[in-house]
């Protein structure tokens, strides 16, 4: 049914079902309101005066049909605007109200006031705020600080054909190359330069220390939204707009650099265990990659993401996709990762379809004639990257891009299961932030949104600038094309390399604990599993807690203190015997042992021999009985059921032989 919603900023029309709740109504309403609206102040009423107004959080669980609303009814909405919206992306600080009013879920739906944020990101629709002297106030990662101190020059040996100088001399043929040298990258078949090499390239053109000019941050993030607080003095958007506050036309080009150059999985077992649910059910699976960033020497000034664990959040797996549920313990998992020296580095999901040959091969769906990354997947990954910005002192906003990576497991052209790694470009992330693009039914095409709503009214929440892209036409000329209504998705992502180490040295060495949220395949995390890992009933001094999922489960038990949890994570990652003995002597660890001893460890089932199963019954008769034929191969069936079958057989005389 169609509901009309009248508010201070005009009339809106929403399409709902009677079984939909007011929470669903709020998810449709909030994106259509001005971005400065505080969702906590939204109220609904049947009267224009608002005498019986109810807050959205109070009626979020009620169905629309329960209130007597029908097709075409009019409801009145009131709300308040935030006094000031702060961006703060450089230092990672944001007020709670601004985050609530501007953050969407991973699937694009707005977050209601009564719901918790999955993580605490900077606002996605906040104004673009510049930071004064970011090189003094912004705290980078230790890896970026180390790479900033390196010159990144590529050494070359003496050319015996061209060099005419002595062994201690140097000329143009043997002098070190810059890390962004195009010829060197082409020879080494490096498609994209690293972000630190790109920084060296643009910094050499932006700042000239020899001229004595003031320093200008060379990195600039794209900004495709209407700027707030325009100095021209006109009313704020959407009441007014001018050339100073409106975004310029967008010209898309392939991004020449990438924030992360390589994705390294600590062991092949990480991927193998992640694929087990698909092998058992044929449904897809999604997981969050936890690891760390290290230097990557294959690419000049390169960075690689080392994956140590995959955590699978609550989800509903289907054959053609995944539906994410609320991840209630995300903060606990991130805290365990932090204590282990890890952080979320990416996301991974499967897109597999069994070839039906019985050899484990998969159908190749992603290739040059179809697509490599679908438009819907690009928008999903771009939102994740927007929630994990990278702080840097080389940008005037204190941030630039994101190190968050995206991995897809699918079948290749040889029918093998392979991994592909990607990152969304900075233009793609900002276009998703600004609500300029949306997925299309064609996975290889991205749509440019229209400013008009479905009812023909002009949108009050987004401004769509002109979008173009450059390509090589059939005559070999570099031409500019209009991106409306759709353009190829290849302009929105870059590819990464991936692999496994030659000598694996994983942080977590024990893979015997069940993985969370796998109850649908019969893999559940229980206290008995912890008792088995810790060998509680065996009274052993040796125990192996080096498992990420085990650490997360122990934290959920809320037995250990913060210091004891930090010590436990240190034992799991550093494998120090001194720390292990110190952990065993703590009060929390002894309490955990007492709980596990009271819970108990399940004893293994007693094996049975076939000779002792039916000592006094004719086996030739039992072998022809349909019940025994069905249970003949089930050796782990309880003995009581098998003897019950024997008693039933003894009460029934054998059938007479057929007449000859």
Curated annotation (Swiss-Prot):
Residues 621-660 are annotated as: Disordered. Involved in the import of nuclear-targeted proteins into the nucleus and the export of poly(A) RNA out of the nucleus. Has a role in the endoplasmic reticulum-associated degradation (ERAD) pathway. The lineage of its organism: Eukaryota, Fungi, Dikarya, Ascomycota, Pezizomycotina. It is a peripheral membrane protein. The gene is npl4. InterPro entries: MPN, Npl4, NPL4_C, NPL4_Zn-bd_put, Ubiquitin-like_domsf. It is found in: Cytoplasm, Perinuclear region; Endoplasmic reticulum membrane; Nucleus membrane. Residues 263-400 form the MPN domain. One of its GO terms (biological process) is protein transport. It comes from Neurospora crassa (strain ATCC 24698 / 74-OR23-1A / CBS 708.71 / DSM 1257 / FGSC 987). GO terms for molecular function: ubiquitin binding; ubiquitin protein ligase binding. One of its GO terms (cellular component) is nucleus. Keywords: Cytoplasm, Endoplasmic reticulum, Membrane, mRNA transport, Nucleus, Protein transport, Translocation, Transport. This is Nuclear protein localization protein 4. It comes from the Eukaryota. Pfam families: NPL4, zf-NPL4.
């Amino acid at each position: 049914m169609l509901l009309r919603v009248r508010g201070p900023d005009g009339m809106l029309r929403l399409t709902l079902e009677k079984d939909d709740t007011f929470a669903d109504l709020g998810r449709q309403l909030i994106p259509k309101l001005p971005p400065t609206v505080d969702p906590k102040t939204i109220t609904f009423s049947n009267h224009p005066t608002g005498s019986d107004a109810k807050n959205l959080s109070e009626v979020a669980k009620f169905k629309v049909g329960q209130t007597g609303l029908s097709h075409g009814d009019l409801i009145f909405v009131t709300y308040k605007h935030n006094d000031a919206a702060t961006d703060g992306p450089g230092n990672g600080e944001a007020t709670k109200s601004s985050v609530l009013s501007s953050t969407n879920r991973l699937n694009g739906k707005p977050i209601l006031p009564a719901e918790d944020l999955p993580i605490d990101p900077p606002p996605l629709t906040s104004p673009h705020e510049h930071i004064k002297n970011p090189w003094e106030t912004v705290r980078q990662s230790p890896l970026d600080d180390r790479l900033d101190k390196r010159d990144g020059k590529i050494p070359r040996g003496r050319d015996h054909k061209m060099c005419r100088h002595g062994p201690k001399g140097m000329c143009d043929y043997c002098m070190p190359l810059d890390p962004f040298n195009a010829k060197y990258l082409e020879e080494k078949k490096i498609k994209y330069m690293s972000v630190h090499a790109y920084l060296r390239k643009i910094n050499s053109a932006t700042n000239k220390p020899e001229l004595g000019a003031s320093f200008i941050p060379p990195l600039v993030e794209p900004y495709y939204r209407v700027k707030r607080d325009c100095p021209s003095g006109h009313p704020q958007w959407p009441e007014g707009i001018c050339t100073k506050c409106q975004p310029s036309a967008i010209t898309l080009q392939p991004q020449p650099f990438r924030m992360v150059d390589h994705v390294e999985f600590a062991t092949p077992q990480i991927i193998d265990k992640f694929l087990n649910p698909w092998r058992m059910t044929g449904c897809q699976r999604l997981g969050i990659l936890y690891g760390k960033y290290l230097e990557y020497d294959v690419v000049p000034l390169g960075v690689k993401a080392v994956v140590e664990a995959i955590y699978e959040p609550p989800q509903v797996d289907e054959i053609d996709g995944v539906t994410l549920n609320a991840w209630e313990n995300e903060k606990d998992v991130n805290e365990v990762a932090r204590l282990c020296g890890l952080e979320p580095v990416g996301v991974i999901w499967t897109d597999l379809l069994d070839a039906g040959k019985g050899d484990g091969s998969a159908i190749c769906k992603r290739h040059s004639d179809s697509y490599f990354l679908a438009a819907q997947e690009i928008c999903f990954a771009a939102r994740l990257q927007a929630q994990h910005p990278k702080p840097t002192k080389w940008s005037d906003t204190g941030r630039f891009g994101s190190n968050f990576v995206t991995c897809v497991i699918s079948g290749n052209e040889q029918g093998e299961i392979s991994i592909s790694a990607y990152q969304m470009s900075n233009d793609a992330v900002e276009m998703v932030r600004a609500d300029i693009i949306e997925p299309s039914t064609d996975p290889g095409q991205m749509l440019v949104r229209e400013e008009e709503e479905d009812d023909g009214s002009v949108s009050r929440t987004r401004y769509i600038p002109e979008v173009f892209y450059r390509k090589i036409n059939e005559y070999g000329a570099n031409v500019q094309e209009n991106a409306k209504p759709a353009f190829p998705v290849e302009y929105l992502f870059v590819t990464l390399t991936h692999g496994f180490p030659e000598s694996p040295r994983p942080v977590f060495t024990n893979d015997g604990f069940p993985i969370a949220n796998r109850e649908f395949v019969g893999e559940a995390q229980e206290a008995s599993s912890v008792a088995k890992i810790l060998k509680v009933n065996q009274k052993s001094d040796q125990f192996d807690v080096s498992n990420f999922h085990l650490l997360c489960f122990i934290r959920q038990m809320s037995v250990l203190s913060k210091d004891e949890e930090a010590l436990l994570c240190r034992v799991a990652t550093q494998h120090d015997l001194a720390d292990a003995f110190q952990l065993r002597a703590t009060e929390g660890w002894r309490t955990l042992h007492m709980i596990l001893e009271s819970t108990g460890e399940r004893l293994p089932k007693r094996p049975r021999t076939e000779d002792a199963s039916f000592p006094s019954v004719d086996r030739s008769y039992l072998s022809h009985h349909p019940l025994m034929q069905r249970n003949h191969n089930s050796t782990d069936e309880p003995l009581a059921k098998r003897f019950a079958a024997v008693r039933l057989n003894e009460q029934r005389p054998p059938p007479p032989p057929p007449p000859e």
